Amino acid sequence: MDIMTTSKTDTLLDLSLACWDYDRAQAVLDGTIAVPGCRIAAEVHPTSTLFPLAVGEARFDVTEMSMSSYILQVAKGEGAYVAIPVFLSRAFRHNGFVVRADAGIENPKDLEGKRVGVPEYQMTAALWMRGILADEYGVDTDTFQWRTGALEEGTRKDRLTLDLPPHMSVTPIEAGESLQDLLLAGELDAVFAPKPLNALVAGDPRVRRLFPDFAAVERAYHAKTGFFPIMHAIGVRKTIAEANPWLPKALFDAFTQSRDRAMAKLESIWRGSANRLTLPFFHAEMEETRALMGPDFWTYGFAANRAELDAMCRWSQAQHLAPRRVAPEDLFHESMIA
């Protein structure tokens, strides 16, 4: 493609942008907040369809992307994008450990040697879940008999080629199978679920969470580590960022303003006399979150998140994804390292 270049005083730089429809991205997506010097053509895509496009064909100039996939690409010197520290998706993951009720798994160490399903071995949720098991509970996740594939329906496979050591057992499930079905049939002992498993929501007695009081465990994890698990960042096409070095900061500022608008709206609802959200205990949740994490609980920027990013880079190498230990500074455009 031709390298697009302009200055902020010249004609506008046309950019395609894609991400999921987060409240914190809405003002950029709908044009309420402009990116100075740019004309944005925004598209909304679920990450299940967007991430293969980002990795496979780099379709968009600016895109939401998986942090685990990105770390792996940086370690290999691959990929079309350079990141800015806009973390559109963050999620605590203790809630996603789902086990068979009869598998004899009462604590994390009991997972060793078990048959464990995960949609993709390299996905960011799995990176975090393995990292938590290793750091907090001393679990050797290399002993797991990993099965990969669709969580509940459809098909899924790792979007990146992995070079795993021979002692690792990572096997795709068959076409037409799902991890949930295998768990319910007793062919898996546990599943790492990046979303609430349908069988769990339905109250199927064959499955349960490893951490029944997961909210308390997740709050304790944050209190101990300071981490609010980063899932996704924003990537800018390298050729465009190189030709327009002002652009990463302009995008960062726009997404930060968009997040601030979303946070202000949440606060106005919290402080209002009528609850505008269809969520009965929103006020309690908001107060608990602020008490634990402070008023700026969805942080962007490099410095405030460096320790967390360093843990992710360490885990990526330890889990046989990245061939080398990546420094967090190497993940982001140079204008973002502050």
Locate each region found by the language model.
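Short hairpin/turn module used for nucleic-acid contact or packing/dimerization
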Residues: 307-338
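Immediate post-signal peptide segment of exported/extracytoplasmic ligand-binding proteins
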Residues: 3-16, 105-115, 292-294
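Hydrophobic/proline-rich hinge and linker segments of small-molecule sensing/allosteric domains
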Residues: 17, 90-106, 229-242
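Pocket-lining segment of extracytoplasmic ligand-binding domains
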Residues: 157-267
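Secondary-structure end/capping motifs
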Residues: 235, 241-318
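Extracytoplasmic "Venus flytrap"
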Residues: 15-25
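Short helix-initiation/N-cap motifs at beta->coil->alpha
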Residues: 42-53, 106, 144-181, 286, ...
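Short, glycine-/small- and polar/acidic-enriched structural segments
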Residues: 23-142, 146-155
